[in-house]
Design a protein with these regions (language model features):
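C-terminal cap of metal-dependent C-N hydrolases
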Residues: 85-120
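His/Asp/Glu-enriched, well-ordered alpha-helical/loop segment
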Residues: 3-95
């Protein structure tokens, strides 16, 4: 698990972190997730963290997997969340624009298939 990326390096476990770590792990076939350390760094910054990894060479699809299905697999909950599949929880976020663009904002959110936020 990589992160938090938007935080000072005061904790021993992040002292040697680098924005290029995600690309290095990807290039070597290692499954990884990107995290924020919520509530210290709010979860709303997760797409920004993924975008920073993309800026440093991680492919966009790998960054998306790092904040969705890979995170769910590492947590052992991928049978319910992390991908859009029949039988999984229907937790979906729809964005105005690309989710890794810091100017984008969430247009709609569904949790368990129920709309909980709607700007459309």
């Amino acid at each position: 698990i990589i992160g938090p990326l938007l935080h000072e390096r005061s904790k021993p476990e992040v002292r040697n972190r680098s924005l290029t770590s995600a690309r290095t792990l990807f290039d070597n076939g290692v499954k990884f997730a990107i995290m924020t350390d919520h509530p210290v760094v709010p979860v709303q910054y997760l797409p920004v963290c993924a975008a920073l990894a993309v800026r440093e060479g991680l492919p966009e699809d790998a960054a998306l997997e790092a904040i969705t299905i890979n995170a769910a697999r590492i947590a052992g909950i991928d049978s319910r969340v992390g991908s859009l599949e029949v039988g999984n929880d229907a937790d979906i976020a729809v964005f105005y624009g690309h989710p890794f663009d810091f100017r984008s904002r969430c247009a709609m959110t569904l949790i368990n298939g129920r709309i909980v936020h709607d700007e459309l």
